[in-house]
C-alpha cells in the first residue's frame, strides 16, 4: 500500500497520446523515453476497510488515493494512483482500477473486472466477472462483458452469437433452394 503510482511522461507527445487523439492513426514511429512522475500524495483508508493479500494501492500523484469506509478489497487487486473508491464497495480478486478513476458507493466489481483511467462508475453499479468498463457507468447499472454493457443487452448479444451457426446453415439452405429455383426457371 502506497507504492509510487504508474505515472510517466515524454518530452514530446507520445505515441499513446497520438493514438488516443486520432483513434488509431499514427504518424511516424519515433524513439521516445519515459520519465517517471513521482507520486507525492498518499493513500487514505477509511474505517473498517479490509485489504487482501498481494493487493496494491498506489499513492496519488499530488492528492491521496482514497478507499472509503467499509470497502473490502480482495487479494490481487490493483488500485491505481489518484483513484477514489466510495464506501461499502466490494472489489473482488484480480480487479484492476486504472489511475484517476472514481468509483461510487456500494459498487461491486466481480473478479477480473477492469476499469479504465479517468472515468466514473456510479453508486450501486454491479459489474460481473471479467467486465471491462471503458466509459462512465451510470448509477445502479448492472454490467457484463467487454466492452461493458447492460446485463440484458449482453445476455441477448450472447444468445444471438450462439444462434449464428444455425442461422448460417439456414441461409446456406435458402441459397441452395434459390439457386435450384433459378436453374429450373432457366431450363423452362
What are these regions (language model features)?
Residues 1-14, 23-150:
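Structural signal for interior beta-strand "rungs" in well-ordered beta-sheet cores
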Amino acid at each position: 500500500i502506497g507504492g509510487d503510482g504508474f505515472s510517466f511522461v515524454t518530452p514530446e507527445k507520445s505515441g499513446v497520446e497520438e493514438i488516443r487523439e486520432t483513434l488509431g492513426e499514427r504518424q511516424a514511429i519515433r524513439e521516445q523515453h519515459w520519465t517517471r512522475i513521482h507520486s507525492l500524495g498518499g493513500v487514505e483508508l477509511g474505517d473498517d476497510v479490509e485489504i487482501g493479500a498481494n493487493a496494491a494501492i498506489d499513492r496519488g500523484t499530488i492528492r491521496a488515493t482514497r478507499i472509503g469506509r467499509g470497502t473490502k478489497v480482495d487479494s490481487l487487486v490493483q488500485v491505481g494512483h489518484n483513484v477514489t473508491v466510495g464506501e461499502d464497495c466490494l472489489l473482488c480478486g484480480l480487479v484492476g482500477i486504472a489511475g484517476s478513476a472514481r468509483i461510487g458507493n456500494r459498487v461491486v466489481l466481480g473478479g477480473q473486472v477492469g476499469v479504465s483511467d479517468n472515468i466514473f462508475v456510479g453508486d450501486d453499479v454491479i459489474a460481473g466477472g471479467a467486465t471491462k468498463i471503458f466509459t462512465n457507468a451510470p448509477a445502479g447499472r448492472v454490467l457484463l462483458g467487454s466492452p461493458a454493457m447492460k446485463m440484458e443487452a449482453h445476455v441477448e448479444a450472447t444468445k444471438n452469437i450462439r444462434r449464428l451457426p444455425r442461422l448460417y446453415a439456414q441461409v446456406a439452405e435458402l441459397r441452395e433452394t434459390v439457386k435450384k429455383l433459378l436453374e429450373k426457371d432457366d431450363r423452362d
